[in-house]
Amino acid sequence: MEEIQNLKKKNYKSVQKNYSEDYLGLDFSYQGLKHLSYSLFQLTFIKELNLKGNDLENIPGDIYILKNLEILNLSKNKIKFLPAKIGKMINLKELYLSDNFISNIPMELGSLYNCTVFEINNNPLISPFNLLYKDKKLLQYCREHNTNYGPPADRTWLDTVIKKDMSEITFSCGTYNILSNYSAVRLGYPPTWVLNPDYRKENILHNICSINVDILCLQEVETYNYEDFYKDQLELRCEYSSVFQPKGRSKNLTDSKSVDGCATFWKKSKFKIKENLVIDFYSKFINDYRFNKNINLVSRYGKKDNIALISIFEISQTKQTLIVVNVHLYWDPEYEDIKFVQAIILLEELEKVSKCYKNPSIVLLGDFNSLQNSSVYSFITQNSVSNTNLCKYNIGFIPGHFLKLSDAYLSEENDFTNFTPTFKGVIDFIFYSDTLELRSILSTIENEYCDQVVGLPNIHFPSDHIFLASKFKLKK
């Protein structure tokens, strides 16, 4: 246990003002405290809080604001009830609650997936909590039954224009990172039954069919799941044709069926496929003299095997060309330079393809693993990147493109497309060319719902990403 700084009987506000963030904890044990001041919860940097041996009867729910807390000692008080929001203190590793008057346990404590020390001895626990604690299964039980929150609002189409021509020809596109089973089963915060592969794929299928877009782009689809389930089920239920491409490592693995990749689906009645192309980012990178001469960049890139799928369609009603790009860029936030390199390759390849067709429309969508303030986003939407970042990335040349792409969700207040206990942000996008007019977008998830949970997946969402979709009109 880290040494607790001895700050007894200090005013909370003066503690915050006079002590730097080097102080890891506070010790207010045996001080006769009956109430906790809200000022305490402003000390969000502390990792350890000792409130043992006081006269506390209630713990304010706002204690969860101490998001960095790893050790919380509330033993030897007079506490009868635990606030459910303690379950949002996901960094807790040790929680001491012994010698209180606690009889019931909120299921939300099951979200404390990092908690390895949980003591609640000498409390009048009711059944089944008393027996579960003896068997060291109490937190596990809470995790499996942590379903005490209401569903989100129904997702609806939000019009982006006031007046529509009812005779206009529109089409819809959607993107959805469905979270691979390999990644899902390693998560510690959702109930394990929520992560069951069969349960998840049925929920994913239900989500897809309920939105029922004309063109669907999925990421993190495992090869066996595509071949054995999604390909046939989506053709049967939604009348989709499809194409799938696993990540590059599938070429060298014996068990290639477990490798995930990108899958693009389209309505057979509305589109005729002309061509499908694959962008293997590693292959393009390692064979490009602009990149492979940079030893540091080559070392950082390693064997990252991300891919993108380019599908060229003829729209059946109008005979116009539509290019749809399904992409999944590298995930790690520590590798902004690699994601930017992948974006350069992506836009250059897309520009080459677009020049092969007369006035094509373009929809570029997927999981870009990049925020709106990133170089990837500004490069795609503004064809720009700061000199500072160019120097930092050590690219060695000034990239550019002539594609005019806009973000379909730019005007929508959207707090996240990916939500986990450690990250909440917008990293999935739908970009479209100036030959298209945006007509509608699928509504996002309200903050009121997110306040109830520590992250996705959960009982309402089978992936840690949400489905994004847009409707477009072809310009004449």
From Swiss-Prot:
Its cofactor is Mg(2+). SMART domains: LRR_TYP. It comes from the Eukaryota. Mg(2+) binds at E220. InterPro entries: CCR4/nocturin_mRNA_transcr, Endo/exonu/phosph_ase_sf, Endo/exonuclease/phosphatase, Leu-rich_rpt, Leu-rich_rpt_typical-subtyp, LRR_dom_sf. Its EC number is 3.1.13.4. LRR repeats lie at residues 22-43, 45-66, 68-89, 91-113, 114-135. Keywords: Activator, Cytoplasm, Exonuclease, Hydrolase, Leucine-rich repeat, Magnesium, Metal-binding, Nuclease, Nucleus, Repeat, Repressor, RNA-binding, Transcription, Transcription regulation. Acts as a catalytic component of the CCR4-NOT core complex, which in the nucleus seems to be a general transcription factor, and in the cytoplasm the major mRNA deadenylase involved in mRNA turnover. Ccr4 has 3'-5' RNase activity with a strong preference for polyadenylated substrates and also low exonuclease activity towards single-stranded DNA. Component of the CCR4-NOT core complex. This is Probable CCR4-Not complex 3'-5'-exoribonuclease subunit Ccr4. The gene is CCR4.
